[in-house]
Swiss-Prot record:
Source organism superkingdom: Bacteria
InterPro entries, alphabetized: Trm112-like
Gene3D superfamilies with a match to the protein in the record: 2.20.25.10
Natural source organism: Aeromonas salmonicida (strain A449)
Protein name: UPF0434 protein ASA_1553
Family: Belongs to the UPF0434 family.
Listed HAMAP family: UPF0434
This protein's GO CC annotations: cytosol
Length: 62
């Protein structure tokens, strides 16, 4: 199931409250400030810090 892009207007990173960006290639929501990637499960964002994946600089979307 795909993410409803309209959600990006109303949800934020639970850590810094910053904007999240959708990485369509890996189906994750990315916080560029905290370098965290939140998974999607059946199109639903899982915005739990303990479920986030730490990104390295090579994985950061431009």
């Amino acid at each position: 199931m795909a993410l409803d892009i309209k959600l990006l207007d109303i949800i934020a990173c639970p850590v810094c409250k910053g904007k999240l960006h959708y990485n369509k290639a890996v189906h994750e929501l990315v916080c560029r400030f905290d370098k965290l990637a939140y998974p999607l499960e059946e199109g639903i964002p899982v915005l739990l810090e303990n479920r986030a994946r730490q990104l390295n600089s090579d994985e950061m979307p431009s």
